[in-house]
């Protein structure tokens, strides 16, 4: 690889936090704030700069993974002296074997090693090297290039593995194509005798899809130690207490403590105080999957609430349930500042009508007095899956520059992001400006409903715009309320054509990224934080996104036998911090949901193309800015102390003269 291409290929995915003005950005409104409510062991992961050492840090490995390059472990900083030394060592077979060896996580084991494998890189051509398959990753390395070339792919990102012809590499060759969930495809070619001897295809299939082969996901074998326990990030009782709950209108209920009331809901829910358990059970019978309206968020002043649920089972004959009607009336009455209730149905009206014919449906306004029903016209999971497929086609491996804008438009991806953001803005505005309580549902209440509640809460509550607040938001609105991560992502499952797969959570994170672009100083986290979350949505390294609901996680011992992603992130917060962050606790954000204000997230969707990445990792520049900021703040504090000391000294010298206190120096850095 020539030097310019190597430099481009080694560039990290950027952290694109723009420098904001004095406020968090356009479209923000003010209201009083609500007060918020908590030595990593070294692993065996060397960076390329430390090839002589058998050890390295987990943090460095993950940074390289997240940096997201087609040759993500290429080291552009190896000196000529080191290169010369390493190339001399190539004559030593033991040294070469050591250099080619894949670094392992605690608990990770090698399953196959294959020499003379060719990686057919769409940007640099064929690269020959050694392929190592472990129970966590596929690791390809070429040590003969300057600098060394490494392709490190967690098996969890693999959607399917297919055999392909490799005639161009010799009649005695065979090949495989690896289709990934993170917007890339990989092609490998190797000798047929290696396939017969080592079963490369079979090994990849077996360990990329452990659940389909009677094995456990690697997260249950991962033994890294972190100084922070990420499982403690979210405690439902503490979070509801932060919101001022329980109160006279709302109670914390443990009716679902054994998951018998609703198996896809969390053990702890918040419901109206006056509602009896018997009536709640009747409401559950009238709601799909028993997902009754429960509180997600309450306004600190107006007491307007966001409640979430599933569709009512009215059916084609407009069936009614007096307990459900009374229940929604109780939700409305809990807000003394409004005599209205707005029901946001995330679905398209036509789709809701189809669901009604099949036994589902939506609230008839004649049966729910003072309730307004609004359809947000968001497409279903199948449309979103197809949209992402089209997007992948235009961004990988090559980009048609002459038709870029029209090709992006043809995927409808940004249009669906716009509709989702627009719906969340309507919800936030109804709560903040209209002081009206809202009920949100789609069909089952775990896809579009989670998108809308979490985005609206992000706009309304500045706590969720902090790192730990955002983690709590994901734990609460997505994980505990039963978004079906296992089905939507397909963890460890070889059924790549499963109709349940859909990029619902990816869309949510994309919407958050769009908000960070419009309000660059309103979020404590940076772009790397969001990319890290998405990378580990697929990786199966952590237990955070495993299973479909809280009950399943308890049954599978996820909380005791796996590590939380937040343990990793919260052990190195400076890596994921936005240096421009200002904690505007009293601001509500209203992002502009217009195509003119939205853009394709190139640093995520197109990060595998070395020609589309910045030459220098922006998140590294932001880290340096944070260090400079801290240094300047320390200097200001030192100067303030010095001025205070001089003032005291001057006052003492004047003796009986009137004392004058120094005016504090308030400096924003």
UniProtKB/Swiss-Prot annotation:
Region Required for dimerization: start-end pairs: 612-669
Q: Which UniProt keywords apply?
A: Acetylation, Cell membrane, Cytoplasm, Hydrolase, Lipid metabolism, Membrane, Phosphoprotein
Its tissue distribution reads: Widely expressed. Detected in skeletal muscle, heart, lung, liver and brain.
List where the protein spans the membrane: none
- Give the membrane topology, semicolon-separated if more than one: Peripheral membrane protein
Composition bias (Low complexity) maps to 1-17, 649-661
Identify the main location.
membrane
Q: Which residues does phosphate bind?
A: 443, 445-448
| Residue numbers of Phosphoserine PTMs | 47, 53
**Positions carrying N-acetylmethionine:** 1
Localization (cell): Cell membrane; Cytoplasm
Q: Where is this region: Disordered?
A: 1-55, 644-669
The active site lies at 442
Q: What is known of its domains?
A: The C-terminal region is required for dimerization.
Q: What functional role does this protein have?
A: Could also dephosphorylate phosphatidylinositol 3,5-bisphosphate to produce phosphatidylinositol 5-phosphate.
Assembly and partners are described as: Homodimer.
Family statement drawn from the similarity comment of this UniProt entry: Belongs to the protein-tyrosine phosphatase family. Non-receptor class myotubularin subfamily.
What is the protein name given in its UniProt record?
Answer: Phosphatidylinositol-3-phosphate phosphatase MTMR1
């Amino acid at each position: 690889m020539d030097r310019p291409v190597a430099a481009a290929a080694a560039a990290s995915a950027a952290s694109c936090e723009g420098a904001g003005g004095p406020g968090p950005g356009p479209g923000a409104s003010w209201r009083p704030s609500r007060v918020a409510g908590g030595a990593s062991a070294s692993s065996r992961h060397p960076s390329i700069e430390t090839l002589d050492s058998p050890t390295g840090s987990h943090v460095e490995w993950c940074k390289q993974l997240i940096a997201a390059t087609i040759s993500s472990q290429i080291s552009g900083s190896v000196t000529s002296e080191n290169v010369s030394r390493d190339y001399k060592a190539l004559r030593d077979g033991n040294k070469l074997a050591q250099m080619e060896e894949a670094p392992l996580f605690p608990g990770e084991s090698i399953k196959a090693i294959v020499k003379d494998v060719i990686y057919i890189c769409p940007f640099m051509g064929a690269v020959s090297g050694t392929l190592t398959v472990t129970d966590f990753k596929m690791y390809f390395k070429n040590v003969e290039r300057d600098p060394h070339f490494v392709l490190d792919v967690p098996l969890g990102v693999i959607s399917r593995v297919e055999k392909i012809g490799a005639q161009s590499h010799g009649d005695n060759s065979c090949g495989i194509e690896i289709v990934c969930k993170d917007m890339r495809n990989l092609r490998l070619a190797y000798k047929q005798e290696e396939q017969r001897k080592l079963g490369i295809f079979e090994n990849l299939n077996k360990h990329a899809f452990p659940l389909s082969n009677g094995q456990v996901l690697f997260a249950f074998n991962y033994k890294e130690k972190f100084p922070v326990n990420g499982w403690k990030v979210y405690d439902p009782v503490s979070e509801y207490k932060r919101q001022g709950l329980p109160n006279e209108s709302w109670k914390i209920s443990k009716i679902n403590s054994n998951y018998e009331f609703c198996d896809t809901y969390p053990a702890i829910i918040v419901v109206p105080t006056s509602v009896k358990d018997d009536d709640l059970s009747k409401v559950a019978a009238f709601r799909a999957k028993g997902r009754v309206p429960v509180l997600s968020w309450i306004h600190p002043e107006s007491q307007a609430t966001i409640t979430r649920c599933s569709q009512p089972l009215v059916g084609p004959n407009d069936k009614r349930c007096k307990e459900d009607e009374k229940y929604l009336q109780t939700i409305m009455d809990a807000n003394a500042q409004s005599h209205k209730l707005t029901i946001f149905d995330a679905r398209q009206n036509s789709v809701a009508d189809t669901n009604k014919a099949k036994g589902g449906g939506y609230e008839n306004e004649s049966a729910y007095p003072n309730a307004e029903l609004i359809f947000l016209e968001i497409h279903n999971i199948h449309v979103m899956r197809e949209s992402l497929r089209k997007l992948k086609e235009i961004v990988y491996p090559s980009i048609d520059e002459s038709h870029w804008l029209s090709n992006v438009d043809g995927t409808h991806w940004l249009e669906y992001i716009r509709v989702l953001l627009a719906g969340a803005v309507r919800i936030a505005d109804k709560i903040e400006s209209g002081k009206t309580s809202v009920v949100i549902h789609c069909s089952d209440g775990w896809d579009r409903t989670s998108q809308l509640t979490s985005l609206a809460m992000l706009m309304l509550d500045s706590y969720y715009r902090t790192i730990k607040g955002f983690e709590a938001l994901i734990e609460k609105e997505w994980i505990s309320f039963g978004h079906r991560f296992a089905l939507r992502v397909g963890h460890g499952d070889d059924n790549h054509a499963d109709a349940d797969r859909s990029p619902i959570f990816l869309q949510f994170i994309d919407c958050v990224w769009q908000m960070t672009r419009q309000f660059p100083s309103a979020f404590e986290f940076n772009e790397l934080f969001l990319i890290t979350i998405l990378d580990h949505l697929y990786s199966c390294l952590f237990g955070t996104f495993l299973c479909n609901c809280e009950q399943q996680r308890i049954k599978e011992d996820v909380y005791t036998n796996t590590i939380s992603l937040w343990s990793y992130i919260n052990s190195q917060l400076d890596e994921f911090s936005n240096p421009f962050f200002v904690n505007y606790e009293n601001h509500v954000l209203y992002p502009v949901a217009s195509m003119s204000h939205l853009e394709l997230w190139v640093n995520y969707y197109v990060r595998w193309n070395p020609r589309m990445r910045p030459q220098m990792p922006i998140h590294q520049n932001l880290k340096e800015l944070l260090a400079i900021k801290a240094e300047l703040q320390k200097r200001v504090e030192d100067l303030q102390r010095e001025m205070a000391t001089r003032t005291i000294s001057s006052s003492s010298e004047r003796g009986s003269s009137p004392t004058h206190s120094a005016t504090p120096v308030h400096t924003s850095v």
